[in-house]
Amino acid sequence: MKMLLKKKAGFTLVELMIALVVIGILSAIALPNYNAWVKKSRRADATVALSRAQQLQEKYRVSNTTYSSSMSSIGASTTSDSGYYTISISSANTTDYTLTATPVSGKSQASDTSCPTLTVTQSSGNSTYSPAACWSK
């Protein structure tokens, strides 16, 4: 009598270890890139809030001949829409103002070291956005 042996199918331990190493390497590359992309996309939350505050400052100046030093007097929120940034007016007078978006501590955006704060400075009719690399224009 001839016995037929069934061939076992499956992965060997070595094959599984190789697959795990490949997954680990891909994860080590992909995760930091993903996190950087998320931080960059969340900066839009700050730029939108700063642009809105800029418009409200100009509207306020038409009626008051000076820029406001208070977010509440221009009708703007001190927090960005998604809550990742705090918006403030650093200085304001008749010809210029500075708006600043600072990441809220304890939120994921607080670890954004590339663009820790975003600033718009309006001076004599010219707007300056800094850091320039953090503004997608």
Model-derived regions: residue spans:
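Short coil/loop residues immediately preceding or within conserved phosphate-binding loops
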Residues: 8, 20, 96
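Alpha-helical hydrophobic helix detector
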Residues: 16-33
